[in-house]
Amino acid sequence: MKNKVVVVGSYNTDMTIKTKKLPGPGETVIGGYFSTGGGGKGANQAIAAARIGAEVCFVARVGNDVLGSEGIKRLNEEHINTKYIYRDNELPTGVAFIVVDDKGENSIVVASGANANLSPTDIESASDEISSADILLIQLESPIESVYASIKSAHDNGVTVILNPAPAQELDNHILKYVDIITPNIVEAEMLTGIKVTDVNSLQSIVNRFFDYGINDVIITLGSKGYFAGAHDAMKIIPALNVAPIDTTGAGDVFSGSPAAFLSEGMTIETP
């Protein structure tokens, strides 16, 4: 039997242009290849977990429009349960405009659209799915009151909660105290703890601060250097594989979705 992961988060239609260099303020550059596809942190993480083999249910909100229908179709093709993807009659499906340079770096602007209307009532409607999951994976592209409702529901039912605190924003301890595992990047870790990353000792201090918040395990992503894994019994850097980047869009999302699947199978955060 597959282990179950519920992802609560965003779905966006990504519109991507590839170009030699990212434009600066007031600058126009000529792009090349253009494509559209599914995206959003929640959707990316759900797909990553499903492709690894987890049974995934995705809770989200899309517009009652063509882009929303296409998104649900894409997710169904990935064998993701879309029963709790709600259609919104007020706002359109979220859209992300992405520019990618020839080094694989990107700049992104997001119009949240229907993602902004995901409500605690939506979360309550999906409570049976959440309570029966092994893992709840959530990000911060949804309204904070819905993030709280999801995390609290999972915690109250003994479900392991993984929070990917992106996009970076300050969070109160009334949310963090219900989180089991947190997966920030350096910017997010610094914002949530007030500790500047300078070396391994500062990473250890950040992990200890998260422990003070009540979080059990910490995964701090370090870009090309890998990630720093912090548990109560061990802390260490897990190095990244040396690969040539093509497009870094969604890389952090895939990283968060993958551990959700592996942890649901009983692996630990120190497993490379």
Model-derived features with residue positions:
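Glycine-rich phosphate/adenosyl-contacting loop at the front of the ribokinase-like
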Residues: 1-62, 66-80, 245-246
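Short beta-strand scaffold segments in enzyme catalytic cores
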Residues: 47, 95-99, 226-230
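Conserved beta-alpha-beta core of the PfkB/ribokinase-like small-molecule kinase fold
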Residues: 135-205, 224-227
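Conserved phosphate-binding/catalytic loop of the ribokinase/pfkB sugar-kinase fold
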Residues: 87-88, 98-135, 140
